[in-house]
């Protein structure tokens, strides 16, 4: 169970509004990483995009956690197979290790991500973000998610990537993040909170009647 899922929380916001469980466009949702505030942007009586206050990023190594003598992990060098990586580590309620690569399209995320995820310096394992800088307002990102492998997108990972890139002077405070599954807009607020804006789309609906599965949800 993850502490927080940026994409998932947008979907929950859309679900509760579209299903008329709330008529509010400003809602709060409790997660294992704390209470998050969502601004639901409605179009044609349904949620189109969601802006999430993802909170203040955690940079202290012992809180992420990362085993290192450095208080803030901004230049963690790890050697994996035939490559050397420099990581900036951030927690958005869950741990992330962000590194810059030259060409994200050709990068073997599985080969390196699977090893980095379980590196001994990450006692709780980690999500690994591989980032290509296009310009100060646009980056491309692929992610190896802890316990899941490469996924099409990761909301907390996009936030962590922008925090890391800004910390290293590579990007501005508002950045468009291009992921395999679509784009997210990330803003570093003056209040030090990270704000994520992205779409939420209904893919399908169905009913679950399997007694064994229903028992697990109770």
Task: Please place each PLM-identified region on the residue numbering.
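Active-site proximal loop and beta-alpha junction motif in alpha/beta enzyme cores
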Residues: 1-4, 9-151, 163-218
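Helical hairpin unit composed of two closely spaced alpha helices linked by a short loop
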Residues: 156-159
